[in-house]
């Protein structure tokens, strides 16, 4: 399913390296939202395949080869770590830099620095408000959200409560998908209610709330055992959310990463 998502943008992104020229030994930096997951692994592999084809097209070998690296935060959605990675990559003066911004406004200082040093920036997966971006490669996220809403409506006979799980509350892709889902339901499905919206970058806070609820249950059952947030699993968080919404007929997740949580 992840490859299908990548294929959707292939005509606008990478289908051929014909006509592309880069100096020998050029370095390209790719920065995603996470270091290791199925989706981001596919992004990294796609970049490597493109550079391999480019080196073959230009006849570059050995030290002359164009190089590409993929980096992302060890914890998905970590804005500070992504900015630190961006700082480190700009210090290497890449020939070009592609980034999937976690926060639409957090990278402006770094983007200014890249512009001053003639480093072109391409955004993919999600975008920012920065005016100097050379190109953007992404899904129509609002339309994707509307499609998700339509699909859920068909599954629950256009009535009932649903829960919405969003990958974060900072990126344009997440905001547009959430907007598309909520707007479509409000406009076309008056008997559907979104009874809860949960953001995965608030997961630590959700674990704290779950720990408090589990501790209360222990006390009600005569146990003094206190549950700590560190011991709470993502499965327990989900179970607690579903317990709070017993009438929920479905859940909408805005990304593949959310469904893996």
Where are these regions (language model features)?
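A residue-level marker of the well-folded mature domains of exported/periplasmic proteins
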Residues: 1-261
């Amino acid at each position: 399913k992840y490859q299908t998502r990548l294929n959707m943008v292939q005509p606008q992104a990478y289908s051929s390296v014909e006509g592309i020229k880069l100096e020998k030994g050029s370095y390209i930096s790719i920065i995603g939202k996470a270091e290791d997951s199925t989706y981001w692994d596919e992004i990294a592999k796609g970049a490597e395949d493109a550079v391999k084809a480019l080196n073959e097209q230009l006849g570059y070998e050995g030290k002359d080869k164009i190089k590409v690296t993929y980096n992302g935060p060890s914890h998905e959605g970590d804005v500070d770590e992504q900015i630190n990675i961006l700082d480190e990559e700009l210090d290497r003066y890449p020939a070009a830099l592609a980034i999937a911004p976690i926060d639409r406004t957090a990278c402006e200082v770094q983007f200014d620095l890249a512009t001053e040093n003639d480093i072109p920036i391409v955004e993919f997966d999600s975008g920012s408000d920065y005016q100097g971006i050379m190109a953007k490669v992404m899904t129509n996220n609002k339309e994707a959200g509307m499609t998700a809403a339509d699909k859920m409506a068909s599954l629950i006979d256009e009535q009932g409560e649903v829960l919405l799980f969003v990958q974060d509350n900072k990126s344009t892709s997440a905001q547009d998908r959430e907007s598309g889902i909520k707007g479509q339901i409000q406009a076309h499905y008056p008997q559907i209610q979104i009874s809860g919206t949960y953001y995965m970058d608030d997961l630590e806070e959700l674990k704290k709330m779950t720990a408090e609820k589990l501790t209360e249950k222990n006390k009600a059952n005569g146990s003094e055992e206190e549950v700590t947030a560190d011991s709470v699993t993502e499965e327990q968080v989900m179970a607690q959310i579903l317990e709070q919404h017993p009438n929920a007929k479905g859940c909408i997740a805005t990304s593949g990463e959310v469904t893996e949580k």
